[in-house]
């Protein structure tokens, strides 16, 4: 097979192996991803950032029918895009029926409250979008990584030590650019539990307001999170895998070694890049605010300004919001993904050898 890589399998077989790993990983890890997104998206109401509360009330109250403008009447504004807005003309809580949106105090609290108030199925919200995004993206990413690493090492463009870092960064940069719109859709589904119709309205409004570039909202922080993550992950993975392989007999399977090396490398990379994950989540969750309130945002902060604002508002803890679910997700998901991928590659290697030996 002339198109096989040095590992003995073709790019198509690499894509099948990595795609299967993406499906298995998504099924196991989506609940943790949902909890992470919910924890990270907890912040002051988007409405309060767009304009002062007094102006927001005056604009909303002026549009009410006269029958609802009498003293003491309250309005619960909810269009499925933003969190409900509780509006009262005298500034008091004059209605006991209104309950504040659910707040989460931690990972286990989020799990319990999501299941109790929204049902178990909510933990897998956004799974279809996740699969549509992750299967082709992961297949392209892992295949590109292996091909780039072989190319760099084969032509001595970089040392074998740093080839995984360079190949991982380049492969992830291309993948992030292609899947950024689907990442935005998945984040909205998980964070605000929108129906697909509401999500479509939200996306169309954003495109009408900011053009097609709005679909790449969050590309900057996503790239800042994923490209360094990929570089760190593959660099550490190859080092840990090489070290562990030297401790075990060569005739033993490498899948277990890949599982351990992938988990350790994923945990380290996830910790170092978590602040950019928080920025990416908060920026993407804000999609739809303009459509819901019919107002223009005061400004669009850069990634670094958002980092400083989060640090000023919530301290270091805010930059590492969702730390536990991200680490709990990153370690096993990286371990499952890479070990499944290695298992698939081993399977195709054996299959190819048998085909070569068969008459």
Curated annotation (Swiss-Prot):
Solcar repeats lie at residues 9-151, 159-243, 253-347. Residues 1-14, 143-164, 236-255, 339-359 are mitochondrial intermembrane. [2Fe-2S] cluster binds at residues 74, 78, 88, 94. It is a multi-pass membrane protein. One of its GO terms (molecular function) is glutathione transmembrane transporter activity. Cleaved and degraded by AFG3L2; degradation by AFG3L2 is regulated by the ability of SLC25A39 to bind iron-sulfur. In absence of mitochondrial glutathione, SLC25A39 binds iron-sulfur, preventing cleavage and degradation by AFG3L2. The presence of mitochondrial glutathione prevents iron-sulfur-binding to SLC25A39, promoting cleavage and degradation by AFG3L2. It catalyses: glutathione(in) = glutathione(out). One of its GO terms (cellular component) is mitochondrial inner membrane. Keywords: 2Fe-2S, Heme biosynthesis, Iron, Iron-sulfur, Membrane, Metal-binding, Mitochondrion, Mitochondrion inner membrane, Repeat, Transmembrane, Transmembrane helix, Transport. It is found in: Mitochondrion inner membrane. The chain crosses the membrane at residues 15-35, 122-142, 165-185, 215-235, 256-276, 318-338. It holds the Pfam family Mito_carr. The keyword Transport applies. Its main location: mitochondrion. Residues 36-121, 186-214, 277-317 are mitochondrial matrix. The activity of SLC25A39 is regulated by levels of mitochondrial glutathione via its ability to bind [2Fe-2S] iron-sulfur cluster. Upon physiological levels of mitochondrial glutathione, glutathione prevents iron-sulfur-binding to SLC25A39 promoting cleavage and degradation by AFG3L2. Upon depletion of mitochondrial glutathione, SLC25A39 binds iron-sulfur, preventing cleavage and degradation by AFG3L2. Mitochondrial transporter required for glutathione import into mitochondria. Glutathione, which plays key roles in oxidative metabolism, is produced exclusively in the cytosol and is imported in many organelles. Mitochondrial glutathione is required for the activity and stability of proteins containing iron-sulfur clusters, as well as erythropoiesis. Belongs to the mitochondrial carrier (TC 2.A.29) family. This is Mitochondrial glutathione transporter SLC25A39. It comes from Bos taurus (Bovine). The lineage of its organism: Eukaryota, Metazoa, Chordata, Craniata, Vertebrata. The gene is SLC25A39.
């Amino acid at each position: 097979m002339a198109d096989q890589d040095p590992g003995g399998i073709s790019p198509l077989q690499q894509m099948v192996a990595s795609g299967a790993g993406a499906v298995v990983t998504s099924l196991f890890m989506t609940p943790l991803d949902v909890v992470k997104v919910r924890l990270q998206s907890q912040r002051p109401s988007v409405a309060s950032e767009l304009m002062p509360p007094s102006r927001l009330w005056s604009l909303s109250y002026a549009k009410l029918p006269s029958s609802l403008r009498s003293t003491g009447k309250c309005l619960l504004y909810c269009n499925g895009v933003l969190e409900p807005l509780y509006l009262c003309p005298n500034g008091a809580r004059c209605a006991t029926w209104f309950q504040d949106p659910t707040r989460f105090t931690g990972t286990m609290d989020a799990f319990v409250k999501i299941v109790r108030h929204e049902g178990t199925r909510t933990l897998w919200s956004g799974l279809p979008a996740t699969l549509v995004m992750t299967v082709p993206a992961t297949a392209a990413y892992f295949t590109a990584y292996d091909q780039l690493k072989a190319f760099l090492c084969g032509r001595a463009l970089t040392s074998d030590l740093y080839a995984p870092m360079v190949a991982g960064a380049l492969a992830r940069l291309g993948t992030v650019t292609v899947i950024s719109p689907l990442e935005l859709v998945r984040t909205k589904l998980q964070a605000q539990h929108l129906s697909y119709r509401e999500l479509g309205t939200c996306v169309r409004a954003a495109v009408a307001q900011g053009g097609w570039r709005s679909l790449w909202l969050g590309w900057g922080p996503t790239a800042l999170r994923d490209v360094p993550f990929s570089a760190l992950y593959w660099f550490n993975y190859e080092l840990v895998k090489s070290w562990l392989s030297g401790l075990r007999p060569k005739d033993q399977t490498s899948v277990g070694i890949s599982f351990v090396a992938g988990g350790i490398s994923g945990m380290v990379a996830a910790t170092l890049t978590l602040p950019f994950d928080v920025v990416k989540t908060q920026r993407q969750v804000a999609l739809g605010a303009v459509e819901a309130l019919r107002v223009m945002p005061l400004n669009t902060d850069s990634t670094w300004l958002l980092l400083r604002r989060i640090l000023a508002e919530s301290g270091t803890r805010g930059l590492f919001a969702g730390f536990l679910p991200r680490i709990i997700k990153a370690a096993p998901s990286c371990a499952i993904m890479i070990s499944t991928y290695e298992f698939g590659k081993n399977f195709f290697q054996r299959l190819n050898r048998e085909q070569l030996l068969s008459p």
